[in-house]
Amino acid sequence: MEEPTPEPVYVDVDKGLTLACFVFLCLFLVVMIIRCAKVIMDPYSAIPTSTWEEQHLDD
C-alpha cells in the first residue's frame, strides 16, 4: 500500500492578517505607554526651550 501524501498546508489569510494587525497594535500600545510614562516622569523635557517665552513684568 502506498502512503497517503500529506495534504498541503494552507495559510489562512484572514487569520494571518488579523494576527499581524494585533501584533502591530500591541507594539504601538507598548510604545505609547513608554512615551506617556516618560512625559509623566519629566514633563518639561518634552517641551522645546525655544517655545518658552520670558515674562516681562512691568513695575
From Swiss-Prot:
Gene Ontology cellular-component annotations: membrane
Principal localisation: membrane
Subcellular location: Membrane
Topology class, membrane: Single-pass membrane protein
Keyword rRNA-binding part of the UniProt annotation: no
UniProt keywords, alphabetically: Membrane, Transmembrane, Transmembrane helix
Domain of life of the organism encoding this protein: Eukaryota
InterPro entries according to UniProt: Cortexin
PANTHER family, per database record: CORTEXIN DOMAIN-CONTAINING 1 PROTEIN (PTHR16736:SF5), CORTEXIN-1-RELATED (PTHR16736)
Name of the protein this chain belongs to: Cortexin domain-containing 1 protein
Recorded name of the encoding gene: Ctxnd1
